[in-house]
A protein has these predicted regions:
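C-terminal accessory module of base-excision DNA glycosylases/AP lyases that mediates lesion recognition
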Residues: 1-37, 101, 121, 125-126, ...
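A positional/architectural concept
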Residues: 20-57, 61-68, 72-75
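Alpha-helical ds-nucleic-acid-binding substructure associated with the helix-hairpin-helix region
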Residues: 6, 10-13, 25, 58-59, ...
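A short hydrophobic/aromatic micro-motif that marks alpha-helical segments and, especially, helix-coil
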Residues: 38, 74, 111, 154-155
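A general alpha-helix detector
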Residues: 48-53, 85-89, 127-131, 163, ...
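Residues that recognize and position ribonucleotide moieties
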Residues: 47, 83, 157
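A broad detector of the eukaryotic-type serine/threonine protein kinase catalytic domain
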Residues: 54, 87, 111, 115, ...
Length: 201
C-alpha cells in the first residue's frame, strides 16, 4: 500500500469543488462555512495525539478547557514537558487518571525512541492506525483523528465518530448511514468530515 497524500491548499480547492459538485448538501455547507483550514495545520504530531487523548468522550468545550489547563502547566506541551510534571498536577488540571497515564506512556515512548511519530508521515494510513492502537488509551477513533489533524491525510472517514453520525442524520435524514454517504465523498472524506463537524458547532 502506498502512502496517502496530504491535505494541501490545492487539495482543499479540489476537494471543495468535487464535494460541491457531487453533493448538494455538502455544497451548502461549503458556502456556509467557507474554506476548510485543514491545509494550514502545523505538523506537531505529539501535541496532536495528546490532544486527541484529552478529547476522548468529551464535548469540544470541555476538551478545550482541559487542554488549556494542561498547556499552562506542561512546558512546551512536549514529551519531556509531560514527563517533568507530577501526575497529580495533570489530574488537578482536569485529566482523568487513565488519560494522564496514557499521555505519560505516549510521552515516554516518544522520548526513548520506541515510537517515531515523525516517521509516520511516510506510512500508509492503515499502518499508522495499526501502530497507534497498540498504545494504551489509543483506539481506532484517536488514531483516525491523528491521521486527519496530525498527518493531514485527505481521505479519512471515522465511522465511529458520534458527531459525524449525528450530522449525517440531521442533514440527510434519520435513515442516512455515514458509511453509505461517505462513498460519494471519496477521496476527500477528511474535508467532508470537517464540514460536518462545523455544522454541529
Amino acid at each position: 500500500m502506498s502512502r496517502a497524500g496530504q491535505i494541501t491548499p490545492t487539495v482543499v480547492i479540489e476537494a471543495e469543488a468535487y464535494l460541491s459538485q457531487s453533493c448538494r448538501v455538502m455544497a451548502g455547507l461549503i458556502r456556509t462555512h467557507g474554506p476548510c483550514p485543514l491545509a494550514d495545520r502545523e505538523f506537531r504530531p505529539f501535541q496532536t495525539l495528546a490532544n486527541s487523548i484529552i478529547s476522548q468522550q468529551l464535548s469540544a468545550k470541555a476538551a478545550d478547557t482541559i487542554e488549556r489547563r494542561v498547556q499552562a502547566i506542561v512546558p512546551g506541551f512536549t514529551p519531556a514537558g509531560f514527563l517533568a510534571v507530577p501526575t497529580e498536577a495533570l489530574r488537578a488540571a482536569g485529566l482523568s487518571s487513565a488519560k494522564a497515564r496514557y499521555i505519560l506512556e505516549l510521552a515516554q515512548r516518544v522520548s526513548d525512541g520506541r515510537l517515531n511519530l515523525e516517521a509516520m508521515q511516510e506510512a500508509p494510513d492503515a499502518d499508522v492506525i495499526a501502530a497507534l492502537v497498540e498504545l494504551p488509551g489509543i483506539g481506532q477513533w484517536t488514531a483516525e483523528m491523528f491521521l486527519i489533524f496530525g498527518l493531514s491525510r485527505p481521505d479519512v472517514l471515522s465511522l465511529g465518530d458520534a458527531g459525524l453520525q449525528r450530522a449525517v442524520r440531521l442533514l440527510f435524514g434519520d435513515d442516512a448511514k455515514l458509511e453509505h454517504m461517505g462513498q460519494s465523498w471519496r477521496p476527500f472524506c477528511s474535508v467532508a468530515s470537517w464540514y460536518l463537524w462545523r455544522h454541529l458547532d
